[in-house]
Curated annotation (Swiss-Prot):
Residues 21-52 form a propeptide. It comes from Conus regius (Crown cone). It holds the Pfam family Conotoxin. GO terms for molecular function: ion channel inhibitor activity; toxin activity. This is Conotoxin reg3f. The keyword Secreted applies. It is found in: Secreted. Expressed by the venom duct. It comes from the Eukaryota. The cysteine framework is III (CC-C-C-CC). Classified in the M-1 branch, since 1 residue stands between the fourth and the fifth cysteine residues.
């Protein structure tokens, strides 16, 4: 019985090797700096002082887009 399982495992590994599985190291790393380069300053409201609004008191301490707090 054990030899049959060994033969089956060997056949499976020969037909479908473990190197065929995609690993995390093969994936491109997430580059937030490169994503931010795709956003132009004209499209991002954080770069426009006139588009940033005034927030109510509790929110103005946590949001960076508030300019009057």
């Amino acid at each position: 019985m054990m030899s049959k399982l060994g033969v089956l495992l060997t056949i499976c590994l020969l037909l479908f090797p473990l190197s065929a599985l995609p690993l995390d190291g093969d994936q491109p790393a997430d580059q937030p700096a490169e994503r931010m380069q795709d956003i132009s300053p004209e499209q991002n409201p954080l770069f426009h002082p006139d588009k940033r609004g005034c927030c109510p008191f509790p929110a103005c301490t946590t949001h960076i887009i508030c300019r009057c707090c």
